[in-house]
Regions:
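Glycine-rich adenosine-cofactor-binding loop
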Residues: 2-17
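Catalytic, metal-anchored helix/loop core of enzyme active sites in primary metabolism
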Residues: 135-138, 146-149, 153, 165, ...
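NAD(P)-binding Rossmann-fold cofactor-contacting core
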Residues: 21-39
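Rossmann-fold NAD(P) dinucleotide-binding segment
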Residues: 45-86
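A conserved regulatory-domain signal marking ACT and ACT-like small-molecule sensing domains
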Residues: 297-299, 303-372
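Substrate-binding/catalytic subdomain of NAD(P)-dependent oxidoreductase enzymes
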Residues: 161-259, 264-266, 285
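Rossmann-fold NAD(P)-binding glycine/threonine-rich loop
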Residues: 70-74, 88-126
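Oxidoreductase and adenylate-handling cofactor-binding alpha/beta cores
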Residues: 119-134, 145-160, 187-201, 296
Length: 372
């Protein structure tokens, strides 16, 4: 297999390193802006050179972002080349266009490293779907948020201090918005739900709330009451269709999620026959992520393409009623659903997920967490 590697950053360099001594996978091109010297590899900025080379059968997209990543991926598929990517934002955003194009052109596409880094989560979901119905998916999908919340819980740190530590260690970007506002997790749970349920979720119907507004006083109150706060993703089958959302969640001490440390991920599925099973590991990093890119390349060599067919676009309906801890919001609606006071916040009576997320849009300084 001759591959063209798009991008030579953290993941791209990792893929190059892991394929260097393989006889079945050959990096023929690297497309990047940097001036790097790689023995036996053509380093270029001219993507048309790759598209015109019929000996290149697979493109590995490791650039990140939406553009030009999607433009390059789309052009590769239209040129009859297989594609592997670790780019969850691109795969999620263009899912409705991507899968039909892959099918039309008769090429193979995989994106295992897009969710869970080195865990192999999407591959496992594809295997599960061969045998049975997946009932629900979700869990801790973002290592940055888990590191921040873990340090706030274990060390009593303020949010800003825990975030700065994560940035110093390379777990958080200089601009951490995609992580702490839940967008990274949102992309991942939508991709996971699409694969698990064989649909394409309408992204506008999947609400998301992050951890940006959490304070040390919240965490102290949770700890006192036997809870640990985690950013939890949820995708599930319901009696009326499908539900999907991302929100901080208070996990009882008895829950496995409550004990996931540092920047690790724990992602879970429940099957009708297999029951509840979880995958645990590093959700990011050069070699864990590159490892699953290479695993995808090996699957392409075996003729294995995407994990599941897509039956069409569906809307998520999040009418499940949960109790929520809320701090920072104050209006007549919140007062009407308040059941009790917890420290500086309140706890609601059970309210629908969609309803409280719609209310939250007008409360920019509010912190919200579901209670299990």
């Amino acid at each position: 297999m001759n591959i063209a590697l798009l991008g030579f950053g953290v993941v791209g360099r990792g893929v190059y390193d892991l394929t260097l001594n393989r006889s079945d996978i050959n990096v023929k091109y690297v497309v990047c802006l940097e001036d790097v010297q790689l023995p036996g590899v053509t380093v270029t900025r001219d993507y048309q050179q790759i598209l015109a080379d019929e000996t290149v059968d697979t493109v590995v997209e490791a650039m990140g972002g939406l553009h030009p990543a999607w433009d390059f991926v789309k052009a590769a598929i239209e040129a009859g080349k297989n594609v592997v990517t670790s780019n969850k934002a691109m795969a999620c955003t263009f899912y409705d266009e991507l899968l039909p194009l892959v099918q039309e052109k008769g090429v193979l596409f995989r994106c295992t490293a897009a969710v869970g880094g080195g865990i192999g989560w999407l591959s496992e979901l594809g295997r599960v779907r061969r045998c049975e119905t997946v009932l629900n998916v979700g869990g801790i999908m973002n290592g940055t948020c888990n590191y921040i919340l873990d340090n706030m819980t274990r060390q009593g740190l303020d949010y800003d201090v825990a975030l700065k530590q994560a940035q110093q260690l390379g777990y958080a970007e200089a601009n951490p918005s995609t992580d702490v506002d839940g967008i990274d997790t949102w992309h991942k749970v939508i991709l996971s739900s699409n694969v698990a349920f064989g649909v394409s979720l309408d992204k506008s119907t999947v609400p998301v709330s992050g951890i940006r507004n959490i304070k040390a006083c919240d965490v102290a109150e949770f700890t006192k009451r036997g809870y640990t706060c985690k950013l939890i993703s949820t995708g599930k089958r319901t009696d009326t269709g499908f539900s999907a959302y991302v929100q901080p969640t208070l996990c009882p001490d008895a829950d496995l999620e409550a004990h996931i440390p540092m920047n690790f991920n724990l992602i879970t599925f429940e099957g009708a026959a297999a029951g509840r099973q979880s995958l645990y590991g590093q959700g990011a990093g050069r070699y864990p992520t590159a490892y699953n890119v290479v695993q995808d390349l090996c699957d392409l060599l075996l003729g294995n393409g995407f994990y599941a067919p897509c039956t069409g676009t569906v809307s998520a309906k999040n009418d499940e009623k949960l109790r929520f801890y809320v701090r920072g919001g104050s209006d007549s609606w919140l007062e009407s659903v308040t059941a009790e006071t917890w420290g500086e916040g309140v706890v609601t009576e059970p309210v629908a997920v969609d309803e409280i997320h719609a209310w939250l849009k007008n409360q920019p300084d509010c912190f919200l967490a579901a209670i299990r």
